Structure formats: C-alpha cells, structure tokens
A protein has these predicted regions:
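Short amphipathic alpha-helix that is part of the acyltransferase structural core
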Residues: 1-40, 157-192
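A short, internal acetyl-CoA/4′-phosphopantetheine-binding micro-motif in the GNAT/acyltransferase core
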Residues: 54, 68-70, 79-91, 240-247, ...
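Conserved hydrophobic beta-strand within the GNAT/NAT acetyltransferase core sheet
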Residues: 80-82, 117-121, 237, 271-275
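Acyl-donor-binding surface of acyltransferase catalytic domains
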Residues: 60, 71-73, 86-162, 298-302
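Conserved acetyl-CoA-binding loop-helix of GNAT-fold acetyltransferases
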Residues: 90-106, 242, 248-265, 284-288
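A conserved beta-strand-loop-helix scaffold within acyl/acetyltransferase catalytic domains
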Residues: 29-46, 65-73, 190-235, 240-241
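A structural microfeature
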Residues: 63, 141-142, 224, 295
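Short glycine/proline-centered loop/turn elements that form peptide/ligand docking sites
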Residues: 256, 279-282, 299-304
Length: 306
C-alpha cells in the first residue's frame, strides 16, 4: 500500500483528532481525548502550525506527528510527539513521520538555533524503546507522573510577608506570573523560555481557570505561583514554582497544598503532577505531601539531522 506523509493543515485536524482517540493511542495522548484538551494543544504557542504531519496508507489515515519548538538558553529544542494506530504499525509509518519531521526541523535549524530533537513515551512501551534506539536516540531522562490519593489536605502555611491572590487578568498579574515563571525555571532541564505574549495565549486557552492560578507576592513582586489545569475528570497541578530568592521558606509547600485543595474542591479525579525524575528537592516535597509515582515517561534525544 502506498505510504504518504503530508503537512497537517486545519482541514486535517479532524483526522488527527480521530487518530489520537483510537484505543491504541488514547493512553499516550490523554490530553487529546477531550475537545478542550485537543484545541488547547493545537493552539499551544510552542506548536507551530507548519510542524504537524499526517501519514496515510492507501488513503487511510494511519498516524501523525507534531513538534513543539521550545525556546531555551542559547537556542531551542524540538519535542516530537508521534502516534501510529495499531493496525498500521510495523509498516514504516513511524519512520516516515520521523523523517518528515527531521527534514523540516533540519531546514530551520540555523534560523531557530535548534540544538536537539526529542521523543518521549509512557512506560512500558518496548516498541517505542526499540524505535528510539534504531533511529539513533539515547535515553536522557525520566519524568514521573505522581498522583495523590484523595483525602485531607494540610492547610497552607503562608510565610511571613507573603500575600496570595488568584489571577485577576490584569497586565500586572500577567507580567508578574511570566517573570516569576522564567526566574523559577531558568536553571531547570529543558527550561522553556516564555514571553509575555506566550503567557497571554495560555491564559486564553479553554482549560485555563483564573481562580485556578495562585500568585504569591512579597511586597510588589510575584515570587511564586501554582497553576492548575482540568481536562476531563483528572486534575493537574500543571505548573508550580518559586523564584530563587523565595526558596527554603515553605512557600512551595504552601502553594502545593493550595493547588491540591483547589483541585479536590473542583472534584478532580485523580489529582496529579509531572516532575523531572532528577529534581530531588521537588520529589522530596511531593512525596512528603502524599504523592506517589504512578507512571514513568521516557525521554530520548539526538542532534537535529542525525
């Protein structure tokens, strides 16, 4: 059967949506199982519309790929998400999609100072492990999905001098959140640099709830934040951080407790978060607040064009 990979335009998004919701891919693409989650991901400020592809076999949609292009220190990195439905696997579809992504990314490597190409998948997935190895990727990181059993949440103990407000949509709140995020995550693995406009896009997405974003201020400066997200039944502590000058005072724990309580009050089932498996301080905090590792996400990397 002829295998064709072509760009995924707006007219192809229904096919991508249907593929992502195939039972063989639903677990890997949980966010895409709801309309709000699908729309938000396709409108992500770091997912260019020209970095999406659809593969067909004999005219039938068989798989897809899309690539996030994330700005970071000194350049950017690409994270390619790929899916091939079960009945079309072991037919070269994944390899063809990766080749299309790599060719497009290689063409813009110098323009965007692209440093690396990444793949990821939930464990266990022996097929993905083998695919990554065959295509020259090396395993570089594990990220963990940690879940917390429903139950009593400790009351946030806000440090002295800290005032917490939910997001009010003002330019001041937007700028404070964006600045605090960049300062909090600048030293993290795969830090994604965010502009004010990037953050504005996030606050306009379907999942965003102003009352689900807490901003912690010391005097007039935003020094911490916790943003929650809902896609269907689960609830995620999607983004939590403190600026370097506000660490070690209990602010992170207080924000985490606020986020968990907000999600439980919103009837989220389960409550979860994602964490870098090598972020020991965050892991200690999350475990001490009742979170346990539920799933492991494998990350692989290679140079663009290899």
């Amino acid at each position: 059967m002829p295998l064709v990979v072509h760009p995924c335009g707006q007219q192809h998004l229904p096919s991508l949506r249907a593929l992502a919701r195939d039972p063989s891919l639903a677990h890997e693409f949980a966010q895409l199982q709801t309309d709000a989650g699908f729309d938000d991901m396709m409108a992500d400020p770091f997912l260019p519309v020209d970095l999406r592809w659809i593969a067909t076999r004999d005219g039938e949609p068989a798989g897809f790929a899309f690539s996030f292009l994330a700005p970071t220190h000194g350049g950017s990195f690409a994270m390619v998400r790929m899916g091939v439905v079960e009945r079309h696997r072991r037919r070269g579809v994944g390899s063809a999609l990766l080749a299309a992504a790599d060719a497009t990314l290689t063409a813009i490597r110098d323009r965007d100072h692209l440093q690396e190409l990444n793949l990821s998948a939930w464990e266990p997935n022996p097929a993905a492990v083998g695919f990554a190895a065959r295509h020259g990727f090396r395993h570089v990181r594990n990220f963990w999905r940690m879940e917390r059993p429903l139950g009593t949440v400790g009351k946030p103990q806000w440090p002295a001098g800290i005032v917490v407000r939910t997001y009010d949509g003002s330019d001041r709140a937007l700028a404070g959140f964006n600045d605090a995020y960049n300062r909090a995550f600048a030293s993290h693995y795969h830090y994604v640099r965010s502009s004010l406009e990037d953050t504005r896009v996030i606050t306009a997405q379907r999942h965003f709830r102003p009352d689900g974003l807490a901003l912690a201020y010391r005097e007039d400066e935003c020094v911490g934040f916790c943003r929650n997200a809902r896609y269907g039944d689960p609830g995620e502590v999607a983004l939590i951080g403190t600026v370097p000058e506000a660490r070690g005072i209990g602010l992170g724990r207080a924000l985490l407790r606020w986020g968990v309580a907000w999600l439980q009050d919103d009837f989220a089932r389960p409550v979860y978060l994602m964490v870098d498996g090598e972020n020991e301080s965050a892991l200690r905090l999350y475990r001490s607040e009742g979170f346990q590792v539920a799933l492991t996400r494998l990350h692989w990397s290679r140079a663009i064009g290899d």
